[in-house]
Structure formats: C-alpha cells, structure tokens
Amino acid sequence: MLLTTSRKPSQRTRSFSQRLSRIMGWRYINRGKMSLRDVLIEARGPVAVVSERHGNPARITFLDERGGERGYILFNPSFEMKKPELADKAVRVSSCPPGSEGLCNLMGLEVDESSSRDAWSIRTDEEYAWVMELMDARGTPAGFKLLIRDFRVGE
C-alpha cells in the first residue's frame, strides 16, 4: 500500500501520514503537485490518501489500483510527539470486534488474538464508534490512536 496526502497538506497532516506509514510498513510519498493518476501509476497497487479538515488529518480514503474507492475512514488522530517503540511493523490486530471487520480489511490488518505487541487494539467507545490504539513492543499503549467516527467499505 502506498500512503500519500491530499494536496497542500498542513505540517500536522504530513507528520501524521509519515508516522502512520512507518507504523504500518506502507510506502509514503510526498504528493506535491502530483495528480491522483500519477500517484496511482507510482503506486502500482492500492493507495491510501489522507485528507484534512481545519488543518488536521481527518479522513483516509482507500483506492484500488485503478483509482476506484474501496472505502474510507473518518477519524480524529491522537498521537504523542515521541515515536512509538516498535520491534516490527504493526500489521496485526489483537481483536476485530463485530462490526469492525471492514475496518480491519481496509487497513490490511491480520487478526491475531495472541498478539499484544506491535499490534492494534480495536474497541468501542462512548464518544466514538471505534478506537484503534497501537500497542508497542512491550505490549503497552504506544501513544498513537485513531478515534474513528465512521467508516465505509465499498462493494
């Protein structure tokens, strides 16, 4: 998966995108004035585009290799300035609660209930539909969360 931003992103959106790409093991490119078509050619596969609202990252749109929308996630980010201490890329999720399977599929996460390190934890919340929290190499919260308001998965 290739991760990029919408055009003219804020520093906070660029920083979030770079950090998410490192955590997930995705390739990241600075979009600049590149068209979405050029991004798809560069990617040669699926693409995730981070968009912003009021200068903050707020949406990740997932595109297939032809540019068709696979789905999107609306979220509020929550991350500390320190980088998470991970031994490996976080491509596993310790649990995928009922109703969040599409979210796991969009992000390309493998469900492994035995993993508690370098993995995501997904849970429900009173204020948000879902909270995706990254667990570090020690199995403790790494200071990186996606507070998910909504997500949609295409057919």
Swiss-Prot record:
GO biological process: rRNA processing
Superkingdom of source: Archaea
The Brix domain, residue ranges: 1-155
PROSITE patterns on file: BRIX
GO molecular function: rRNA binding
Keyword flag Metal-binding: no
UniProt keyword annotation of Ribosomal protein present: no
UniProt keyword terms in alphabetical order: Ribosome biogenesis
Its biological purpose: Probably involved in the biogenesis of the ribosome.
Identification of the protein by name: Probable Brix domain-containing ribosomal biogenesis protein
Species name: Methanothermobacter thermautotrophicus (strain ATCC 29096 / DSM 1053 / JCM 10044 / NBRC 100330 / Delta H)
